[in-house]
Amino acid sequence: MNGVATVTYVVFNGTNEITSLEGDITKEADATIPCTTVTLSDILSNTAQYESMRVKVEMVEAKDVFTSNDDRSATIVDGDLELSLYNGYGSSTYKEFRVNAYVNVTGYPYMYVKNSTSTPTLKVWTGDIEAVKDDAVNITDAQYGTAYYADAFFMPMGATGYIAESNGNGGITLKETYAEGDLVPAKTALVLNAPKGNYDICLAESDAIAPTNNLLHGTTTEKLTEVEGGTYKYYKLSYNNEGNDLGFYWGSENGAAFINGAHKAYLALDSETLLSQSRGFSLADLAHGVTTGINTTVKSATQSNFIYDLNGRRINSLNGAAKGVYIMNGQKVLVK
């Protein structure tokens, strides 16, 4: 509506309610009600400023949910802040939310008064689920962990996500790809870097595509590692035999498949490449992109005479090979 009006109102449960209205008012078709994005802190600290305004709060956690219409039992939280909700509109979709989901809620703030007690409240008009909380990812003292989910998820606050990719020089490197708050596409296997602690994973819906050059893979349940389309060596995030260097190391003898943990990521390398003959790679090397097939190959008494060129391609024999440098059992061999 547009125009000037004279109204009579009463205060009911802390809300100014119009009882009569007079004036020259023109109805506007298809009008859009302005909506202001606010935080819980905004509403709680100055409810009067936003009273009867249409506002929207984003990415807050549903602590309790409605069980019926005309229900005041639901609350949303943001850290230590908590706001009561009122399901006063029959069209409200908030009743469909799940506890612990991260939600966006649109409504009208007011001060609910009962028994001389005033409570800041948001009368819900509508809302939607932004993300659903899943089990937390544990980051150890080493400040690293891995993650893999069938659904998209938001990178936890304080965490950074890395993929593993070829560095174009016969080696691999960890590439910083997702910052805190970023939406990670479904089925994206990651190394996470964050201070020690448990980090909630908030699942979301997204059509974004996972990076296709990622050498990390994962499973949503405890399952044998497997990558289709070739023969692979498999590496698990763990410490080396000395227990002093965290990285990706063979999870089973000779890089064979191993049982991967639920929602964990692992590294898979084509067994025909020079890199796959390495027993493992420290995160320090991977983070700086200095890992190559030459300086990471680990020799053993039972190692076969595999031969590779400097691009990591395996060749059958040095007989008839073009002039150049080749790698055999981790040693450089010059063909003149």
Model feature map: region roles:
Residues 1, 164-167, 190:
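Contiguous mid-protein beta-loop-alpha structural module that forms a pocket-lining wall or clamp
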Residues 52-54, 71, 185-189, 263-264, ...:
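Short, surface-exposed beta-edge/turn micro-motifs
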Residues 101-107, 188-192, 323-332:
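Append "Rare intracellular matches occur via the same short Y/T/C beta-strand/loop motifs
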